[in-house]
Amino acid sequence: MAESLHIVGAGMAGSEAAWQAAEMGVPVVLHEMRPKVGTFAHRTGQFAEMVCSNSFRSDDDERNAVGLLHWEMRAARGLIMEMAAAHRLPAGGALAVDRDPFAESVTGRLRAHPLISVVEEEVADLPSSGNWIVATGPLTSSALAESLRALTGAEALAFFDAIAPIVYAETIDMEVAWRQSRYDKGETEDERTAYINCPMNREQYEAFIDALLAAEKTEFHEGETAGYFDGCLPIEVMAERGRETLRHGPMKPVGLTNSHRPEEKAHAVVQLRRDNKLGTLYNIVGFQTKMKYGAQTAVFKMIPGLENASFARLGGIHRNTFLNSPTLLDDRMRLKLRPNIRFAGQVTGVEGYVESAAMGLLAGRMAAAEILGRDLPPPPPETAMGALVTHITGGAEAKSFQPMNVNFGLFPPIDARGGRRGRKDRYKAYTDRAKAAFTEWLGA
């Protein structure tokens, strides 16, 4: 039998890496410290637990980079995308999932695989021998982070992710709010009415901004710096950047018509997205926050339609630790100083559930191929996975390296006409080129 592959962390990346390697015939030992050692953000001991949003974002594989990444992961028979499809919720053009059954299904499939064994323990040191993938995610334990610093001589970088609150659907006033996906996107009625919308006029919006700015915030611990990933900024930080920032961001009113008062144009709109299959829970889209709990309740109840809302979960912040990957990793995602160790997921400096799982997919396949005596190069940079791994392992500037979502700006340019119509054609050209290149890579 082949040598074993040890994987540290059973989040999105570790779970996908374990599945891919085991499916290639390599025995996997999956190390997960939960539930014995918990974190601020996790609630369970399940694998691939979604601690922030329940959305994998756009599922458009023709004109959206993350949708293309979905396509590539499906083509590679990814476990995360398979389980996401099994627990999909209506969300317009987005791919949202019922988070608890999703995590339970991922956990069940991995535990049932004959080549995967699970060890519930914390790994505190970077091993000097054996085959390893470290996929510890944004909440890498202090002991392991210290081990990494000692080995590399480099400081792990840190920023903070904020978590959005979740509301009980029955407590939303539907005489004020209405159901509609932006621009009525979706093929079914469920998808076209996937979001609950709460309108604000100018006076309500201005009062809301004042309350956000005045609210008491959570303080950082000594020695921590308040850096954020732009894709997960707390709403109060966005408000500090300008009073109009929110209504051009998560509170933008475009593409929505109030079904109660169609003649009235809202100044701003707060959207809530279904968080479970039963439709009993909704999360407030883009409303991640570091306000203290008491302040959150008061401020969020200023939103029309949420005056009597009850919260299943309030928002919060958690630390996110990641490597300076362009300096530390080679193009096979191996640690240059100790090539028996690969890294995958958010700890490498990608941001997002799908991006993390995709890096796990690559790391798992690359590690398994190496154990089996083969070399597996990364996908071409024209693909979504290839563009991401190229970015984190050398395409990005090391001095200014920050976590990155997949986007077409990471892809090699394509020759296509500009303009509004041209932009859509250009995105389609990117995805057509990527699909052909990825299919060829899979078959090599």
Curated annotation (Swiss-Prot):
A Gene Ontology BP annotation from the UniProt entry: tRNA methylation
Binding site for FAD: 9-14
Enzyme Commission (EC) number: 2.1.1.74
Keyword Flavoprotein: yes
Cofactors that this protein relies on: FAD
Recorded catalytic activity of this chain's protein: uridine(54) in tRNA + (6R)-5,10-methylene-5,6,7,8-tetrahydrofolate + NADH + H(+) = 5-methyluridine(54) in tRNA + (6S)-5,6,7,8-tetrahydrofolate + NAD(+); uridine(54) in tRNA + (6R)-5,10-methylene-5,6,7,8-tetrahydrofolate + NADPH + H(+) = 5-methyluridine(54) in tRNA + (6S)-5,6,7,8-tetrahydrofolate + NADP(+)
Leading EC class: transferase
Locations listed in the record: Cytoplasm
Cellular component GO terms, alphabetical: cytosol
Key words of the record: Cytoplasm, FAD, Flavoprotein, Methyltransferase, NAD, NADP, Transferase, tRNA processing
InterPro entries listed in its UniProt record: FAD/NAD-bd_sf, MnmG-rel, MnmG-rel_CS, MnmG_N, TrmFO
Molecular function as annotated in GO: flavin adenine dinucleotide binding; tRNA (uracil(54)-C5)-methyltransferase activity, 5,10-methylenetetrahydrofolate-dependent
Function in brief: Catalyzes the folate-dependent formation of 5-methyl-uridine at position 54 (M-5-U54) in all tRNAs.
Family the entry assigns: Belongs to the MnmG family. TrmFO subfamily.
The protein's name: Methylenetetrahydrofolate--tRNA-(uracil-5-)-methyltransferase TrmFO
Source organism (scientific name): Cereibacter sphaeroides (strain ATCC 17023 / DSM 158 / JCM 6121 / CCUG 31486 / LMG 2827 / NBRC 12203 / NCIMB 8253 / ATH 2.4.1.)
